[in-house]
From Swiss-Prot:
Catalytic reaction list: RNA(n) + a ribonucleoside 5'-triphosphate = RNA(n+1) + diphosphate
Annotated family: Belongs to the potyviridae genome polyprotein family.
Keyword vocabulary terms for this entry: Capsid protein, Nucleotide-binding, Nucleotidyltransferase, RNA-directed RNA polymerase, Transferase, Viral RNA replication, Virion
Region of interest (Disordered), residue spans: 397-447
Site (Cleavage): 388-389
Record PTM: Genome polyprotein of potyviruses undergoes post-translational proteolytic processing by the main proteinase NIa-pro resulting in the production of at least ten individual proteins. The P1 proteinase and the HC-pro cleave only their respective C-termini autocatalytically. 6K1 is essential for proper proteolytic separation of P3 from CI.
Listed Basic and acidic residues bias regions: 397-424
One matching Pfam family: Poty_coat
Name used for this protein in its record: Genome polyprotein
Ranges for domain RdRp catalytic: 92-216
Amino acid sequence: LVRKRCERLYEGRMGVWNGSLKAELRPAEIVLAKKTRSFTAAPLDTLLGAKVCVDDFNNWFYSKNMECPWTVGMTKFYKGWDEFLRKFPDGWVYCDADGSQFDSSLTPYLLNAVLSIRLWAMEDWDIGEQMLKNLYGEITYTPILTPDGTIVKKFKGNNSGQPSTVVDNTLMVLITMYYALRKAGYDTKTQEDMCVFYINGDDLCIAIHPDHEHVLDSFSSSFAELGLKYDFAQRHRNKQNLWFMSHRGILIDDIYIPKLEPERIVAILEWDKSKLPEHRLEAITAAMIESWGHGDLTHQIRRFYQWVLEQAPFNELAKQGRAPYVSEVGLRRLYTSERGSMDELEAYIDKYFERERGDSPELLVYHESRSTDDYQLVCSNNTHVFHQSKNEAVDAGLNEKLKEKENQKEKEKEKQKEKEKDGASDGNDVSTSTKTGERDRDVNVGTSGTFTVPRIKSFTDKMVLPRIKGKTVLNLNHLLQYNPQQIDISNTRATHSQFEKWYEGVRNDYGLNDNEMQVMLNGLMVWCIENGTSPDISGVWVMMDGETQVDYPIKPLIEHATPSFRQIMAHFSNAAEAYIAKRNATERYMPRYGIKRNLTDISLARYAFDFYEVNSKTPDRAREAHMQMKAAALRNTSRKMFGMDGSVSNKEENTERHTVEDVNRDMHSLLGMRN
């Protein structure tokens, strides 16, 4: 595949690029100014061929971030931003240059300069050289399909969807920056003493010696000569006011922490694009991570997250342990590379177990904040949410020793509960036991103590259990935990291995792959809802492709079905029920099975198919209706074990012997009597 794409690029056959609007939130004033940004996606042919040409150079380029005057490939976490800002000398003038309409303003001259750099760095390979030239020709003069169906051809600017956009943009700004410095009269040696700059795409950040600040005034015109629109008016004396890639570094514990504008972080919470509840929780966690350093904002996001976890369906995810969370210690580690202390981690686990109540633990959600309160307890129904202060905030599960300690505490609690149950046989006994891990306190003789409520065991020694030689043949501990799904052990549906053999057999007979089988089985399920799963069906079944009927032979379905086709289709019961409910959400729909039985209640339509699996959750009314329909379908039905014998011959051998004295051919002699 890649070879074919490279061949196409080598021959100069251009693909059509797809132009679309970027899905993003932008300030109202920018929208009113009609500065909506577009995105041009490369066709697959160009994309794969281009990656062969540019990937090696790009990987080298990423590896040189911070060593050379660019930050492409750096991470803002683990003190990456601190390293970046400390590259700028203290006391200099700092400028965050603002480039506008960058991609569309790039001239073919700059793109050709990037091509020259790549050709210089490239190995000696004539085919690759031609591919690279054709690629940058296509990037400069690109055929673009717009959303209204028009194809336009641009003659300048870079494409946002090509595989080397950021590296190419960085190189073009780098070339322009060197051009501006040389034009201002600074050679390489002088430049190192008076100017430090870093680039990432169209973002440019400059630190310049105060004695040479006037040079910045000439940069705008120098950049314009190469077609770039840059404003160098934003100048600062404090590094914390310097904006780069929409971030500015704020000092926390003498470390520069990168921070987005609070409005951008709140926008992550406001704009909900998620299709699954898990994705919504991940977006909130992302906002929490970005907000660290804005103490008030982090606290408010944690409060919002607490509220979200009390709402459906997020509360169920939290109970299942599927709600992501990052502790204060985790965030501090992410930005500063500082590990949490053992005391912090132990405090977190101790607080977790201290709040557990009863035999079934309630939902516990821990939130850390930077507030001065030690603990803020918020209760809602059976949910406890704890806000821990910065000093008390810890992260759990980071150390094996802590896990062992956690398991040990659980075992001690179980032993304590068993002791309490054993000591509850006498109703007058008073429990004076203390919490696990606490010192025994002196008992005040003036108090009555606490009574232990007796528990009834599910299985007791009084039960009559099957035994051999006095020993029980059942493992009661296993039986207490053995709660299989009814459908997995029911003999009304095929086993997993039987279903797998049926699937493989049908797939091979039909000559389909797994993706095609998925579509085909959709049609089969709907056909069986309408026509049933009788073992006597034959001929063909059909599914619709638009307005066209597509026939499939029924024979493979029945041949490979063991024990029966209905038991195979029982695996589709739940999906069929959901399909009928989906149809009824938009139209009145009753399967033919229900129509034939004259089922008048449309609310029972979802149960009106013959391979429906009745289970413990089936409503009584639906179960009765299904049984009545089944009884009506099978009324007066009988099956003969034997049919007519296929052998129709009834020949038999005549062993009768006659003589001339016999009366006739049917009668022997009557003792000498004659007519």
